[in-house]
A protein has these predicted regions:
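C-terminal structural segment of proteins
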Residues: 1-265
């Protein structure tokens, strides 16, 4: 095993490109250790790149339009930060359900998002979060997560609640550790206005082995139903969910969506 401490985020990204598949960014390492054959023995063929020694990745700030959260921020520090509580309360709710305190104190937001299946992923995807990359450019999180080789992410930008009027947003996690069962499904739902009902324009979901993504077929179904003022059935919603989720998870997702849209009464 090799561990390198690059001088800057740009140098880290350049090294990762040079090493190719052998490269692996590491921060808290809480997720990486779960994939190792021996939890305390890192794979010898992997070249780890430490990303936890640059101040710019470990701070939270307010810009004119966005809340900036450094990718190297510890999960528990993000959860407790007053600006995050003010501008991203649903992210705080998701973080409160994420693992044990020891995990939250060690793991980072960048690691959770980079994994693509973490609790924070649906929330940030549903809020149209942006990512700051090492070249200084901004990219939508949706676009970043589609890349096979995900770049090093410096920070995440979320809309400020005192600049952009917040839209109704909820987070759902089915089967979490408080019930001593592994999480089966993580979802975030966002409505276009305070009336809620069928005005659901963002449905983001992730599950073990299934990267976070939007359920666009379901979004289109609800938009069509809202336009025509018709009531979609639970079976209609489940069928659209099955376009990207296995049947058992599609059943769970469809009931959550229908319930939040007032379609189960």
């Amino acid at each position: 095993m090799l561990l390198t401490h690059p001088s800057s985020p740009r140098a880290a990204q350049a090294l990762a490109r040079k090493l190719g598949n052998a490269a692996c960014f590491i921060a808290g390492g809480t997720l990486l250790q779960q994939s190792w054959a021996e939890p305390r023995l890192a794979p010898s063929a992997t070249h780890f790149i430490n990303v936890m020694h640059w101040p710019e990745m470990q701070q939270i700030s307010l810009g004119p339009q966005y809340l900036h959260i450094g990718a190297g921020m510890r999960l528990e520090a993000v959860r407790r930060h007053p600006w995050v509580q003010q501008h991203a309360p649903v992210l705080v709710q998701a973080l409160a359900q994420l693992g044990a305190m020891g995990i939250r104190r060690l793991g980072t937001l960048g690691g959770n998002i980079g994994w693509g299946e973490g609790d924070c992923c649906p929330v940030l995807l549903a809020t149209d979060a942006q990512v700051e990359l090492t070249d200084g450019n901004l990219q939508s999180l949706a676009q970043t997560l589609k890349l096979m080789d995900r770049p090093l992410m410096l920070s995440f930008l979320l809309p400020r609640s005192d600049v952009t009027e917040p839209r109704p947003l909820v987070f759902e996690k089915v089967g979490y550790r408080a019930a001593f069962s592994p999480a089966r499904l993580r979802m975030a739902l966002r409505w276009s206005d305070a009336q809620k009902r069928l005005n659901l324009d963002r449905i983001a979901a992730a599950a073990p082995g299934i990267g976070v993504h939007r359920l666009q077929a379901t979004e289109k179904l609800l938009s069509y139903a809202q336009e025509l003022q018709i009531r979609p059935s639970l079976d209609d919603i489940r069928t659209t969910c099955e376009q990207s989720l296995p049947p058992d998870l599609a059943r769970i997702a469809s009931r959550l969506i229908a319930g939040h849209c007032g379609l189960l009464a």
